[in-house]
Amino acid sequence: PEKRHLFQIEIPNTMFTPYLYESQGIEIALSNSEIDTVLWNAAAPGVPTEGIKDFLGYLKSKGIRTGVISNISYAPSVVAERINRLLPENAFEFIITSSNFMFRKPNKRIFDLALEKAELQPDEVWYIGDQYECDVKGSLNAGLLPIWYIGAIDLPYTEDINILTV
């Protein structure tokens, strides 16, 4: 099972891959961001979740503000490029990645940063995520209303917490 959430700290690929290649005597004529793009596209080409474009369009039409908090080791520019390419009509006010800010969900600091960027209080925010430990428990601990999106992955949970699921 996934255990990275226990550490709550991200080591970005832009730090790790240069070490990995240099320590093995491998020379690559690509920037760190280009390496991230190649690796991520090979590992997971990316496809929008079914219904996400309509859902984001609905939120936008109702004036509901949106942003992204992502636990990911790829460069922030690579993440933003992929999100904007796959969801070109998104209205995300910000994209926060653990690779850029060190802290991983469920660490409260990454949620606090999003609240600061949005200039909102925790009780004004609904947080939707697909990972129980990182998204649901993390946002709940930060005072946000967690909504667990269970359509992306099917993981059971054992705790008796009253949460919304979609």
Q: Where does each model-flagged region fall?
A:
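A metal-dependent, Asp-based hydrolase signature
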Residues: 1-37
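Short, exposed beta-strand "edge-strand" segments with a Pro/Gly-rich flavor and a Y/T-containing core
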Residues: 4-14, 46, 104-105, 159-166
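A structural signal for alpha-helix termini and helix-coil/disorder junctions
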Residues: 22-26, 45, 89
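Surface-exposed cleft-lining segments at the edges of enzyme active sites
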Residues: 37-46
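Asp-based, Mg2+/Mn2+-dependent phosphohydrolase catalytic module
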Residues: 53, 57-60, 67-166
